[in-house]
């Protein structure tokens, strides 16, 4: 029987160029909820999470992408891989489990327009 609950790490990405991100751990996540439901949950959580700097709380995140899955190979990119978007970006309306999310998956949460801009010219400013 598959585990219905999982521990997920969500990396809040404010800037790809400056490698400005903050990882957060979410426990007891229902993998049968939709991507939209999880995005709403994360946005609500970060808006009130103690210890999270205001710039991270107020940023307009809109997209989730799988960075790493348990027991899988990690990317050499410091923020996240720029490859396999079709496979790794979570689709609206899809259930987390159906999108490939499992226990101990690490996800990036970012603004898609920033990602597209960075992907077209991937340089770092630090």
UniProtKB/Swiss-Prot annotation:
InterPro entries: UPF0538. It comes from the Eukaryota. Belongs to the UPF0538 family. This is UPF0538 protein C2orf76 homolog.
